[in-house]
C-alpha cells in the first residue's frame, strides 16, 4: 500500500523558508569567532560603503568592475551581507552569472556568452564540469579586515561561510569562478586585498591560449581565472547503503528535528529499519517489500537517511492526482497501452453516439417526411389508388343516374368520402421531437381530418375552393343549357319568327330553365380526382429522371437570348410541359397536362401568378360539314371574338429545380418506407440502398485503426471506462517512493545526492515520489521536486511531489537563440497549448525576420529540445511605469531602458518546470537584460511561469473628476521620449490616463536567486468581503511564498463576475476596492473560488460542509463574512436565490410545512430548523448571494427581468428597506429596463432616534452600534431629498413609514402574488385609549349584569332586523382594532428586502454548535484567533475580547466600524505569524496589544438618475471629553451645482473637526469621480485645499468639484502623496524647532483649545526658514520624481553641485 509512506516528514523545521529566502543564519564552528551571512538589502549599501577605507576603495576599483555598489547589488544575481555577532555589517559579496567586465556579443548573437570562449582560453581540468547551471562568478568580495582587525584565518572563515551560504541558497551549484582583472597585476594593494582567499579557497586555472582573450571585449589580456570547487568550503558527502552502526548518529538528527517518529515507533526504529532493509513501516500493519535505507556520510559520521521502496498504490495515486502528464508513473509502454485502450473506448463511445445520433436523425427524418404535407399527400394518393376502382365506379354510378344524383346531398358526399378514406390515418410526429427539438425545428404537425386533407389536395388539381360548401358546382351550367337548346333548334324545321311582346311568365320560365340545380355536383370532384391519380409515383419518377438526364436543356429554357441564366421568375408552369415536349423529351400527356398541379402538390414549387389577355383558340377547320353549315346559318347571330384572360404561373430555374428535388426526396422516402408503389422508383431506391451499404462499410473500415502490438495489451483489454486503471504489473511500475528522509541542516544542499543514488539502486525506475501533509513546509529537497495538482474530487490529505530521472541532467541545460532547424521538433511542446498556432507563428517570425521585435530562445537538455521561449527585444517602459507600481520592485534608475524585456510565450517540458527561473535568468544574461515582464490579459489561463514571477500592483492616474487633464506635452517631451515605433507595444500611450487592460508581473535577475517556496497549507476563506479579499491579496503579495491551496468561498461568485459598468450594480459597495482593482487582482485565476456557502462546521474533523452537498477540508479556516439583511430570516423564509441550492431544497423537504399544517398547528415531522421554515418564489433578500444572477438581463423568456420588462402585462417589484442598498437596487432595475412605475419602494420607520451630540465616547459607540444594525441610506439630508424627489418625479411609488406585514402567496406554485404593509394610524394613541375605555365598560357591564356569566344573548339579535340591531361594545372594539393601522396592499411579483442588519443566523448557529464564543459578535483575540487555534475570524461579525477593554479606551472593540481592507491586511500578518512566516512582512505588533486601525471607511452607489454617490468618513471614535462637548468651530463646506430638472452637475460636502481636519466628505454627481481621491481627502488639513474655505465663502469658487479638478490639485490625489506627507512629517519631528511648537500646541489643547485659524497662524510664524525650505525642496523633489503622473507641474531643473 502506498499509504506506507504517509509518514510525517521529520525535517519540517520552519527555517526551510528562511533558507529559501537566503536569510538563513550560518555560524562558524569556532566558538571564539562567529559570523552571520544573509541576503543583502539595499539599505546595506550605505553601511558597506562606510566600512570601506580609502585605500581599500582604490584596491576594489581595480579588483572589481562596478560603477557603484548600489548598482552591483541591484543588477547582479546574488548579493550577501556579512555580519558579526553584534549584528554589525563587516562585509559583502556579490555573485553574477557572467564574469565582471564582459561586454558585447562574442558569437554575434548572444550577450555575456562566456562559455563560448572560456574553455578555449583556459585549461580547465577535464574532471571539472562547469556550466552556467552549476557555476557562478564572484564579482565583488569585501571584508573590513583592517577596521575589525581580522586575521588571515578569520578572513578565510568568513569567505567559507559566505560560500556555504551561496551553496545552501543554490544547491545546484558545484563551484564558483572568479576573474581577476589584468589591471591588478601591478598593484600590490589590490593583490593583497584578495590574495589569501585566492590562494586558500580558489584554484588558479592555467591559461591555454591568451590570444583568444584579446577578442573578448571588456576582458584584459592579462586577466586570470580562479575556480573554487564546492568541496573547498563544504565537506564532501558520501552516499551509501545504511549500516546498523549508523543508528546513533541518525537518532541524534531525528530527535533534534522531530519527536513524532520516535514516539510512534520507539527509540530503536532506525536501527530496526536499517537492519531489516526491507521493513518500511512498523506497527499494526507489517509486510515485506524491497525497501532500502540510504545514508549520507561525512567523514565517519552519518548525517542523513533516506528510506525508499517501490511499494506504491498506483491506482490510488491516479485517482487523487493529475498524473496523466507523467504517464501516471507507469512505464511508457504500459501507459501507451492504457491510452490506446482509452482512445478505443473514446472512439467507440464517440462512434456509438454518432451512430445513435444518426439513427435518431434518420428516424426523425422519416417521421418528419411522413408527417409533412407532401408525405401525407403521397400516402393519401397511394390509399386512393388502392381504392380507385371502388371510388370511380361509385362516382360514375351517381353521375349517370339522374334519380340518385338529384337526391345527392353534402352529408351523403361526406359519408362517401369518409367511407373511401377508411383505413387512412394522418401521421403525427413522435415524442422524439420533444427530446431533440433542435434537430428539425420546423417539423409540421397536421391537425386536419383525412377528408379535409383530400379536399385540400384535390384543390391543386382543379377542385374549386370551398367545394364542399357548394362553390364551383355546376360550372358553365347556363352555357351548357343554351348549347343544348341550340342543337335542339337545329334539329327542328325553321319557322318565321315574328315578334311579340314578352310576358312575365315566359321570362320566369326561361330563368328557371337556366338556373343551376340545387343538388350536389360530383363532376368537379371526379375531374380533380382523376388528375390526382394520373400523376402517380411511376409517372413522377419517369418525369423526374428525364428532367435529370436533360438538365442542360432545362437550363437553356430558363436562359435569355444571350444564354445567361435569368434569376427572376419568367417561365410559365402551365406551358412548361408543352415546351419540354418541343425539346423531344416525350413527357406523358397526363404529366404534361398536370405539371403545375403536381409540382405544387408534391414539390411545393414557388411561383408568382400573373393574368394576361389572349385571343381565344381557333376552331378546328376539319369539323363536320353539317356543323360548319350550321355555323354559317347562324353567322348573323355570331359576335366578333374578344380576348380572354389567361393565368400564368411564373417560376425560375432554381425554384423549379428545388421543387423537383424535394419531390424526389419524398418519393424516395415514401418508397423506402413501403408506402408508395413504383417499379421504376423501387429500382432507384435499391441502388441508393446499395450505395449506402457501401458507404457504411467504407466508414467502418475507416474507423478501424491498425496498431503495432503492445506487450501490455492483455492487461488493459478489460477496461470499460476512461478513468479506471488496471492492475499494474511489476515490470510496468516506474517509480520509487521515499518513505522517510532526514538530513543535518548543514548538508541540506546535498539532498539531491540521495535521489541520484536511489535511482542507481532501482535503475529501471524513472520517477521518485514523496507525499507529506499539507502543513509541512517544503524542504530543500522538495524545492527540486514537482508538486502535482490534486483532482477536484480528491480527499487525500497529503500532497504529492515527483522527480524525474532526466532532471538529474539539468547540468546539461543549454539555452541559445532559436534556429529554423529547431522548428521541426516543437510539435510535442505546442500540442497541448491553447494558442499553439500563435506561438508557432511568433517563434517563426522571431527566427526568420531580423526586423522582428521578438526573440526566440530554445532550451536543450542533453541535446534534446525541451522548451521554447519568445521574448521581446524591448518594452514600452514608460507605459509600465505609469500604469503599474514597477518602482515597488526595482530601482528604476539602475535599470536603463535597454535592460527590460517582456515574456510573450513559453512552452516547456513539464518535467523541467523547476528549472524555469534558471531558464529565465539565462535568457536575461544572453540578452544583457535585468528585468522581465509578463502581461496577463483578461480571461487568460495563467501559465505555470506566472508562479515564478512577482505580481505588480496597478496604478491609477491622479484625478478628482474622471476626465482628461487640462494639459498637453510640449515638443521637447516627445523629443526626449524618442521614436517608439520600433519598440514593443510602442503605440501604447504612457499618458492615456486609462486603466491598463491587462495585469502585469515582473521578475528581475536579483529575484531569481530566491527560490519561491510552495506553502501547501489549506487556507479556506469564507466570504468575499473586503476583509477576505484584502487578506488573500496580502498573502499573494508575499514575494517568496507561493500559497497553493487558498480557497475562497464566494456564493454567487466575486463582484467582477457580474459588474462591468456602474449601471450593472444592484447594491451599494464599499470604497475599499474599485472594480478596476478587483479585476487587476485576478482572484478567480490565482485562487480557487467556489460558488458555495458554508452550512456546517466540523472543527474536530477540520472540514466544512457546503450547500452543494460537498465537504471541504482545511488547515486554517478564516471567516470573513459580513453582516446581512435578516428580514427574511426573522420570518423563517429562504431567499429565492439560495433555494436553487440542493441543500436548501432538501432542508425544506425535511423541515417544511404547508399552510394547512401550520394552521392546524401540526409540528414538523423532523422538528424545526433553527433558521428556515418556508420559501416564497420571487422573495429575495438584498444580501442574497445570487441576486445578480437572478436579476441578470439574459433575454430569456420568463426570466425575472423579462417578467418585469415585457410589453404585455409586465409584473411589478417591491423593494422594502431603508438602506442605501435599496436605492442602488432601484437604480439597477431601471438600468435593466424596468419602467419606474412598476417599482414600489416601501421605507420602514427608524428604530432609534438620530443623535448628534454625545456626553462621552461610550455613549457614542452605543449609538454607532445601533447605526450598524439600522443604517441610514444617507448621512446628508440634502442628498436624500434630491434622490427621493428624482425617484418620485420618474414615477417610482414611494411609501414611507410602513412595516412589512404579510406576503400573499399562491399556495400551489409558491409564487409571490402581493405584499401587505402596515403602519400605525395617525390617531393610534387615541384609539388605544378608546379601546381601554371600552374594555373597562365591558367589565363594568358584566359585573352589573345578573347574567354576566352568560354574556350577551346574541340569539335575539339574530332573530331581529340586523340593520336595527344595536352596536355592542365588542363590535366597537373590533372596529377600533381595525382602525389602529393603515394598510397598503401592493400587487407585486417580486419582493426584495433590506431590513435590520445583523449576523447571518446560519453563521450564528455554526458558531454556537462548535463552541466558539459569541456575545453579540464572535469574540476573537487581538490576532483575530478564536478559541480554536486554527480558526480565524475577522470583519464585521467580530469583536475583540473584553480582556482588551483597557486597551481600547474610546475605541470600539467591534470590528464593524473599521476599514475592511485594513483589517484583511492585519489578519494576513497574524496568519503568517501562525505559519511562522511573520518575518516576511514589515507589520509588527504583539498578541497583548490591539492593532492600530486608522484607515477611513466609506460607501458608494450608483443611484437613480445615473448619479454617483460616495460618503467617506474618518475612523475616529476616540475623542477627548472636551472635544465631545465642544461645539463645532468650522462650518461645513457645501457646493451644490446639480440641476434638478436636467439631473446634471455635482454636489460635494466637506465636514471638518475642530482642528480643521477633514472628517467626512460626501459626493453626488453625474460625473464619475476617483474614489481614491475622495478617500485621500479624509484626514487632510483644510490648509491643503488652497484656501478653499475663504474663496468659497467669498463666492470666488462657484463649483468646488471643478475647482478640485484643476491642475493645482492633481498632486493631492497622487497615490504616493500620503507617503510623502508621512516621510516629511517624520523628518520634521527630528527638528527641535518643531518639537517646541508641538509642545506649545499640546499645552494649548490641554486647556481646551483647538487648532483655530488664529492659533495656526501663531505657531506657523515660529517655524524656522530652514524647515520651510526643507518642505519646499521635498515637495519639488516629489513632483520631479513623479512627472509621469504630474506633468502639469513645472519643476525647475535640479541644481547639481560640482566639487
UniProtKB/Swiss-Prot annotation:
Positions with biased composition (Basic residues): 489-503
GO biological process assignments: cilium movement; cilium organization
InterPro entries xrefs: CFAP61 (IPR038884), CFAP61_dimer (IPR056299), CFAP61_N (IPR032151), FAD/NAD-bd_sf (IPR036188)
Pfam families the record matches: CFAP61_dimer, CFAP61_N
Amino acid composition bias (Polar residues), ranges on this chain: 1-22
Statement: the UniProt record of this protein carries the keyword GTP-binding: no
Keywords carried by this UniProt record: Cell projection, Coiled coil
Keyword Kinase: no
Protein origin, superkingdom: Eukaryota
Chain positions covered by the region annotation Disordered: 1-23, 489-515, 1340-1365
SUPFAM superfamilies according to UniProt: FAD/NAD(P)-binding domain
Cross-referenced PANTHER family: CILIA- AND FLAGELLA-ASSOCIATED PROTEIN 61 (PTHR21178:SF8)
Biological role stated in the UniProt entry: As component of a spoke-associated complex, regulates ciliary mobility by mediating a stable and functional assembly of the radial spoke 3 (RS3).
Record protein name field: Cilia- and flagella-associated protein 61
Originating organism: Tetrahymena thermophila (strain SB210)
Organismal lineage: Eukaryota, Sar, Alveolata, Ciliophora, Intramacronucleata
Gene (name only): CFAP61
Amino acid at each position: 500500500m502506498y499509504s506506507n509512506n504517509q509518514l510525517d516528514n521529520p525535517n519540517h523545521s520552519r527555517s526551510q523558508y528562511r533558507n529559501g529566502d537566503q536569510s538563513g543564519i550560518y555560524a562558524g564552528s569556532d566558538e571564539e569567532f562567529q559570523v552571520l551571512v544573509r541576503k543583502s538589502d539595499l539599505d546595506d549599501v550605505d553601511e558597506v560603503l562606510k566600512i570601506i577605507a580609502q585605500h581599500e576603495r582604490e584596491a576594489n576599483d581595480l579588483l572589481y568592475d562596478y560603477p557603484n555598489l548600489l548598482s552591483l547589488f541591484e543588477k547582479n544575481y546574488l548579493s550577501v551581507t556579512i555580519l558579526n555577532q553584534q549584528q554589525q555589517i563587516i562585509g559583502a559579496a556579490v555573485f553574477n552569472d557572467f564574469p565582471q567586465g564582459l561586454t558585447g556579443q562574442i558569437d554575434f548573437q548572444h550577450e555575456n556568452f562566456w562559455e563560448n570562449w572560456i574553455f578555449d582560453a583556459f585549461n580547465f581540468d577535464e574532471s571539472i564540469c562547469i556550466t552556467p547551471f552549476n557555476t557562478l562568478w564572484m564579482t565583488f568580495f569585501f571584508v573590513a579586515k583592517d577596521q575589525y582587525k581580522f586575521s588571515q584565518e578569520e578572513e578565510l572563515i568568513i569567505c567559507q561561510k559566505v560560500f556555504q551560504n551561496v551553496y545552501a541558497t543554490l544547491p545546484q551549484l558545484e563551484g564558483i569562478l572568479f576573474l581577476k582583472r589584468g589591471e591588478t597585476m601591478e598593484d600590490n594593494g589590490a593583490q593583497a586585498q584578495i590574495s589569501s582567499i585566492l590562494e586558500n579557497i580558489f584554484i588558479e586555472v592555467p591559461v591555454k591560449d591568451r590570444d583568444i582573450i584579446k577578442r573578448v571585449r571588456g576582458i584584459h589580456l592579462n586577466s586570470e581565472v580562479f575556480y573554487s570547487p564546492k568541496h573547498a568550503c563544504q565537506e564532501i558527502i558520501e552516499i551509501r547503503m545504511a549500516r546498523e552502526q549508523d543508528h546513533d548518529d541518525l537518532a541524534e538528527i531525528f530527535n533534534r528535528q522531530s519527536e513524532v517518529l520516535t514516539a510512534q515507533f520507539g527509540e530503536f526504529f532506525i536501527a530496526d529499519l536499517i537492519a531489516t532493509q526491507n521493513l518500511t513501516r512498523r506497527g499494526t500493519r507489517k509486510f515485506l517489500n524491497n525497501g532500502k535505507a540510504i545514508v549520507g556520510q561525512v567523514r565517519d559520521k552519518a548525517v542523513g537517511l533516506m528510506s525508499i521502496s517501490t511499494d506504491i498504490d498506483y491506482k490510488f495515486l491516479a485517482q487523487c492526482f493529475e498524473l496523466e502528464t507523467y504517464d501516471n508513473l507507469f512505464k511508457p509502454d504500459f501507459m501507451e497501452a492504457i491510452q490506446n485502450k482509452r482512445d478505443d473506448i473514446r472512439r467507440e463511445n464517440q462512434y456509438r453516439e454518432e451512430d445513435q445520433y444518426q439513427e435518431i436523425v434518420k428516424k426523425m427524418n422519416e417521421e418528419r417526411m411522413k408527417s409533412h404535407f407532401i408525405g401525407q399527400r403521397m400516402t393519401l394518393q397511394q390509399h386512393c389508388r388502392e381504392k380507385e376502382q371502388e371510388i370511380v365506379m361509385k362516382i360514375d354510378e351517381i353521375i349517370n343516374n339522374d334519380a340518385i344524383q338529384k337526391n345527392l346531398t353534402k352529408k351523403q358526399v361526406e359519408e362517401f368520402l369518409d367511407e373511401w378514406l377508411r383505413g387512412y390515418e394522418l401521421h403525427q410526429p413522435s415524442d422524439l421531437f420533444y427530446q431533440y427539438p433542435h434537430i428539425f425545428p420546423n417539423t409540421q404537425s397536421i391537425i386536419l381530418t383525412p377528408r379535409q386533407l383530400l379536399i385540400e389536395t384535390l384543390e391543386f388539381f382543379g377542385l374549386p375552393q370551398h367545394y364542399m360548401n357548394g362553390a364551383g358546382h355546376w360550372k358553365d351550367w347556363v352555357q351548357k343549357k343554351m348549347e343544348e337548346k341550340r342543337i335542339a333548334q337545329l334539329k327542328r324545321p325553321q319557322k318565321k319568327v315574328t315578334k311579340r311582346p314578352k310576358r312575365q311568365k315566359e321570362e320566369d320560365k326561361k330563368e328557371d330553365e337556366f338556373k343551376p340545380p340545387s343538388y350536389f355536383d360530383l363532376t368537379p370532384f371526379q375531374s380533380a380526382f382523376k388528375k390526382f391519380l394520373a400523376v402517380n409515383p411511376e409517372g413522377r419518377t419517369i418525369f423526374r429522371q428525364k428532367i435529370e438526364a436533360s438538365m442542360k436543356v432545362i437550363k437553356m429554357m430558363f436562359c435569355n437570348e444571350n444564354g445567361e441564366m435569368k434569376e427572376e421568375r419568367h417561365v410559365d408552369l402551365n406551358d412548361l410541359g408543352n415546351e419540354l415536349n418541343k425539346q423531344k423529351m416525350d413527357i406523358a400527356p397526363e404529366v404534361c397536362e398536370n405539371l403545375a398541379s403536381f409540382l405544387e402538390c408534391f414539390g411545393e414549387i414557388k411561383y408568382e401568378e400573373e393574368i394576361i389577355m389572349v385571343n381565344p383558340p381557333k376552331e378546328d377547320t376539319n369539323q363536320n360539314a353539317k356543323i360548319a353549315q350550321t355555323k354559317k346559318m347562324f353567322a348573323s347571330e355570331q359576335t366578333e371574338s374578344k380576348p380572354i384572360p389567361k393565368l400564368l404561373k411564373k417560376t425560375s430555374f432554381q425554384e423549379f429545380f428545388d421543387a423537383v428535388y424535394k419531390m424526389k426526396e419524398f418519393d424516395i422516402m415514401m418508397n423506402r418506407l413501403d408506402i408508395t408503389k413504383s417499379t421504376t422508383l423501387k429500382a432507384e431506391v435499391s441502388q441508393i440502398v446499395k450505395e449506402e451499404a457501401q458507404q457504411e462499410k467504407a466508414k467502418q473500415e475507416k474507423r478501424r485503426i491498425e496498431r503495432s502490438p503492445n506487450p501490455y495489451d492483455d492487461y488493459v483489454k478489460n477496461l470499460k471506462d476512461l478513468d479506471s486503471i488496471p492492475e499494474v504489473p511489476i515490470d510496468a511500475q516506474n517509480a520509487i517512493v521515499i518513505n522517510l528522509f532526514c538530513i543535518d541542516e548543514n548538508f541540506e544542499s546535498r539532498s539531491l545526492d540521495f535521489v541520484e543514488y536511489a535511482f542507481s539502486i532501482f535503475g529501471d525506475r524513472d520517477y521518485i515520489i514523496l507525499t507529506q501533509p499539507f502543513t509541512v513546509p517544503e524542504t530543500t529537497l522538495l524545492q527540486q521536486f514537482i508538486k502535482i495538482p490534486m483532482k477536484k474530487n480528491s480527499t487525500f490529505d497529503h500532497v504529492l511531489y515527483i522527480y524525474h530521472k532526466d532532471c538529474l541532467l539539468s547540468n546539461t541545460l543549454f539555452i541559445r537563440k532559436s534556429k529554423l532547424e529547431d522548428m521541426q521538433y516543437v510539435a510535442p511542446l505546442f500540442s497541448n497549448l491553447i494558442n499553439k498556432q500563435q506561438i508557432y507563428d511568433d517563434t517563426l517570425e522571431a527566427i526568420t525576420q531580423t526586423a522582428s521585435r521578438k526573440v526566440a530562445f530554445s532550451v536543450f537538455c542533453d541535446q534534446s529540445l525541451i522548451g521554447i521561449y519568445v521574448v521581446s527585444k524591448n518594452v514600452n517602459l514608460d507605459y509600465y511605469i505609469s500604469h503599474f507600481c514597477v518602482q515597488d520592485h526595482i530601482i528604476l534608475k539602475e535599470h536603463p531602458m535597454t535592460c527590460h524585456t517582456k515574456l510573450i510565450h513559453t512552452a516547456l517540458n513539464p518535467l523541467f518546470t523547476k528549472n524555469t527561473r534558471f531558464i529565465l535568468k539565462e535568457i536575461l544574461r544572453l540578452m544583457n537584460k535585468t528585468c522581465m515582464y509578463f502581461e496577463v490579459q483578461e480571461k487568460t489561463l495563467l501559465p505555470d511561469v506566472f508562479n515564478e514571477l512577482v505580481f505588480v500592483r496597478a496604478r491609477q492616474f491622479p484625478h478628482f473628476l474622471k476626465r482628461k487633464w487640462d494639459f498637453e506635452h510640449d515638443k521637447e517631451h516627445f523629443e526626449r521620449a524618442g521614436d517608439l515605433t520600433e519598440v514593443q507595444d510602442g503605440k501604447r500611450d504612457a499618458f492615456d490616463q486609462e486603466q491598463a487592460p491587462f495585469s502585469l508581473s515582473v521578475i528581475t535577475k536579483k529575484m531569481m536567486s530566491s527560490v519561491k517556496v510552495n506553502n501547501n497549507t489549506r487556507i479556506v476563506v469564507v466570504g468575499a468581503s473586503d476583509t477576505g479579499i484584502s487578506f488573500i491579496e496580502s498573502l499573494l503579495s508575499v514575494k517568496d511564498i507561493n500559497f497553493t491551496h487558498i480557497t475562497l468561498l464566494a456564493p454567487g461568485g466575486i463582484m467582477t463576475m457580474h459588474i462591468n459598468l456602474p449601471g450593472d450594480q444592484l447594491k451599494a459597495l464599499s470604497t475599499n476596492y474599485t472594480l478596476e482593482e478587483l479585476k487587476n487582482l485576478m482572484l478567480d485565476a490565482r485562487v480557487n473560488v467556489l460558488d458555495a456557502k458554508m452550512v456546517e462546521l466540523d472543527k474536530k474533523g477540520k472540514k466544512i460542509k457546503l450547500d452543494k452537498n460537498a465537504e471541504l477540508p482545511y488547515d486554517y479556516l478564516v471567516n470573513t463574512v459580513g453582516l446581512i439583511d435578516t428580514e427574511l430570516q426573522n420570518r423563517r423564509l429562504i431567499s429565492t436565490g439560495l433555494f436553487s441550492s440542493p441543500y436548501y431544497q432538501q432542508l425544506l423537504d425535511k423541515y417544511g410545512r404547508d399552510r394547512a399544517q401550520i394552521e392546524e398547528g401540526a409540528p414538523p415531522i423532523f422538528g424545526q430548523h433553527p433558521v428556515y421554515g418556508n420559501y416564497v418564489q420571487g422573495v429575495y433578500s438584498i444580501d442574497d448571494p445570487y441576486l445578480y444572477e437572478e436579476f441578470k438581463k439574459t433575454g430569456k423568456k420568463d426570466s425575472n427581468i423579462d417578467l418585469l420588462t415585457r410589453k404585455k402585462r409586465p409584473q411589478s417589484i417591491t423593494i422594502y428597506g431603508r438602506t442605501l442598498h435599496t436605492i442602488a437596487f432601484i437604480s439597477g432595475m431601471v438600468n435593466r429596463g424596468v419602467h419606474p412605475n412598476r417599482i414600489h419602494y416601501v421605507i420602514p420607520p427608524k428604530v432609534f432616534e438620530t443623535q448628534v451630540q454625545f456626553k462621552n465616547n461610550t455613549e457614542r459607540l452605543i449609538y454607532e452600534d445601533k447605526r450598524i444594525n439600522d443604517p441610514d441610506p444617507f448621512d446628508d439630508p440634502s442628498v436624500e431629498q434630491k434622490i427621493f424627489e428624482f425617484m418620485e418625479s420618474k414615477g417610482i411609488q414611494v411609501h414611507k413609514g410602513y412595516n412589512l406585514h404579510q406576503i400573499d402567496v399562491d399556495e400551489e406554485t409558491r409564487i409571490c402574488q402581493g405584499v401587505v404593509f402596515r403602519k400605525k394610524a395617525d390617531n393610534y394613541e387615541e384609539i388605544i385609549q378608546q379601546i381601554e375605555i371600552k374594555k373597562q365598560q365591558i367589565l363594568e357591564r358584566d359585573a352589573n349584569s345578573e347574567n354576566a356569566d352568560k354574556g350577551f344573548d346574541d340569539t335575539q339579535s339574530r332573530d331581529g332586523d340586523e340593520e336595527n340591531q344595536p352596536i355592542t361594545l365588542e363590535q366597537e372594539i373590533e372596529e377600533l382594532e381595525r382602525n389602529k393601522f393603515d394598510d397598503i396592499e401592493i400587487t407585486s411579483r417580486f419582493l426584495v428586502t433590506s431590513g435590520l442588519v445583523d449576523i447571518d443566523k446560519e453563521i450564528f448557529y455554526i458558531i454556537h454548535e462548535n463552541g466558539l464564543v459569541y456575545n453579540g459578535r464572535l469574540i476573537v483575540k487581538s490576532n483575530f484567533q478564536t478559541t480554536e487555534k486554527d480558526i480565524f475570524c475577522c470583519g464585521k461579525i467580530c469583536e475583540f475580547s473584553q480582556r482588551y477593554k483597557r486597551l481600547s479606551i474610546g475605541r470600539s472593540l467591534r470590528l464593524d466600524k473599521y476599514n475592511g481592507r485594513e483589517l484583511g491586511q492585519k489578519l494576513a500578518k497574524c496568519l503568517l505569524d501562525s505559519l511562522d512566516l511573520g518575518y516576511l512582512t514589515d507589520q509588527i505588533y504583539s498578541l497583548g496589544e490591539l492593532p492600530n486601525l486608522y484607515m477611513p471607511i466609506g460607501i458608494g452607489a450608483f443611484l437613480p438618475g445615473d448619479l454617483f454617490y460616495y460618503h467617506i468618513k474618518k475612523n475616529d471614535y476616540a475623542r477627548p471629553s472636551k472635544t465631545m462637548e465642544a461645539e463645532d468651530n468650522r462650518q461645513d463646506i457645501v457646493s451644490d451645482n446639480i440641476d434638478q430638472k436636467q439631473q446634471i452637475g455635482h454636489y460635494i460636502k466637506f465636514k471638518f473637526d475642530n482642528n480643521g481636519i477633514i472628517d467626512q466628505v460626501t459626493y453626488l454627481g453625474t460625473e464619475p469621480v476617483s474614489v481614491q481621491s475622495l478617500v485621500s481627502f479624509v484626514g487632510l488639513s483644510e490648509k491643503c485645499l488652497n484656501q478653499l474655505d475663504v474663496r468659497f465663502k467669498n463666492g470666488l469658487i462657484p463649483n468646488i468639484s471643478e475647482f478640485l479638478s484643476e491642475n493645482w490639485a492633481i498632486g493631492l490625489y497622487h497615490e504616493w502623496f500620503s507617503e510623502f506627507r508621512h516621510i516629511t512629517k517624520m523628518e520634521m519631528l527630528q527638528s527641535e524647532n518643531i518639537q517646541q511648537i508641538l509642545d506649545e500646541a499640546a499645552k494649548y489643547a490641554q486647556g481646551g483649545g483647538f487648532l483655530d485659524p488664529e492659533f495656526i497662524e501663531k505657531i506657523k510664524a515660529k517655524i524656522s526658514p530652514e524647515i520651510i525650505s526643507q518642505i519646499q525642496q521635498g515637495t519639488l523633489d516629489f513632483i520631479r520624481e513623479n512627472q509621469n503622473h504630474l506633468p502639469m507641474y513645472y519643476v525647475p531643473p535640479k541644481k547639481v553641485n560640482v566639487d
